[in-house]
Structures are given as structure tokens and as C-alpha cells.
Amino acid sequence: MAGMALAGRAGGGLGERSAWQSLALALLPMQVCAVGTFVVLLRRERAGRPWGALLGWRAPAGLTTRQLLCRLGLEWLTLLAVTLLISQAVMWGARALGVELEAQHVVRLLQASGSPSLVALATLSATVLAPLSEELLFRRGLHGVLAWRLPARLATPLTALCFALLHGQLHTVPTLVAIGLALQWVCQREGLRQAILLHATYNASQLLLLALTVLAEP
């Protein structure tokens, strides 16, 4: 999602073609490289080769697929509820202070474009590329580096804060920090695969809500 946020910022006020180019330039190189790295590490992990253990793809022993799916559903519902409460609190606070909050960059970009190809790319990014690339980058990469030098009580919130700030808008930071903390918690206890699935499920539900909102507009 960070790539889409940055692309939206770059494409604000531009035509559809410029928005598309900005989106592609900001989004695809970072995410494709990260997904390529993910595939290499996954192959190494399955083969028991060096560096493969860095991925941490597998869930802890003793958890069945059914148990993981049940946990995924509960985690998704909990994350939806928590982020909704935080978002509403931010909106109420901004309203009380007389501050007008702008729509997220990706929301404005998709609403202004109306391009099926742009919507398709955004959907692919949000539900596949972003979960894979961002979980590898933040939950394994950045958190692994920080945890090597700092206590976990500092490494985890710092990783979540970096995850939030990369998405580009100040008023979304509290919500995104909560998402980052939740994904790190899931990753450490249930493996990277579960964190990726939760990230993808959450993003897909947000895109669905956005689509319903756009369709409901006159």
C-alpha cells in the first residue's frame, strides 16, 4: 500500500496517463524486487539452504490449517474493529479541532481515474504484491535488523512506526501503527505466511469497502 500512497501523491492533479505512470514507477520496481527476494528465500527455506531460515514462512508446529484459518478470521475481525475505532477517534479529534482531513492518496487517485487497468493494478498491488513485499521488508527485514540491536519492546513499535510513515499521510499514522503492531505480533507467533494472509485479507476488505463507497456515490 505504501507504493500506492506515494504514487498518489506524485500523481495528484495530473491526468489519467500521468497518474498511471506515477503509480507504475513508484509501485512496481519496489514490490517486484521484494517479491523476487521473497521467492528466493522461500525456495532456500524449503531446501534447508543458508539464508532460508530468515524467511520464517512456516507456522509453529502443532497448529493445523483449520486452526490457522480460524485464527486468521478472528485476527481480521479484531483488526477491522480496532482500526475502525482508531480512525473514528482521529476523525472526531480533527473535527473538534476544526481540521479537515483529506482522503487517502490512493482513494483520490482511484476515484479520479476511473481507469479499469489502474483499478486492476491497484487491486493486484493491495492484495498480492503489497502484503508479500511489505511483510518481508518490515516484519522480517527491518524488524530483524532493529531486534538485533535493540530490545523487542523498542524494535516492534519502531518497525510499526516506519511502516506507518512510509504510507505518506499524518492522519493515517495511528491506524497504520496499530496495523503494523498487529502484523508483527502475528508474524512472531504464527509465522510470516499468516501475517501475509492477514495483510492481504485486510487490504482486500478495505478495497471492497472503497468500491462500495464509490458505487454508492451519485
Where in the sequence are the language-model features?
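Selective recognition of hydrophobic, aromatic-rich stretches within alpha-helical transmembrane segments
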Residues: 21-46
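Active-site-flanking alpha-helical
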Residues: 137-146, 174, 206
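Membrane-embedded alpha-helical segments of multi-pass membrane proteins
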Residues: 29-33, 124, 174-181
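Functionally important transmembrane alpha-helices
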Residues: 153-218
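Solvent-exposed interhelical
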Residues: 144-156
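Structural signal for the C-terminal ends of transmembrane alpha-helices
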Residues: 8, 40-49, 185-189
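Structural signal for membrane-spanning alpha-helices in multi-pass inner-membrane proteins
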Residues: 4, 38-42, 83, 87, ...
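Juxtamembrane helix-loop-helix connectors linking adjacent transmembrane helices
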Residues: 7-27, 48-130, 148, 216-218
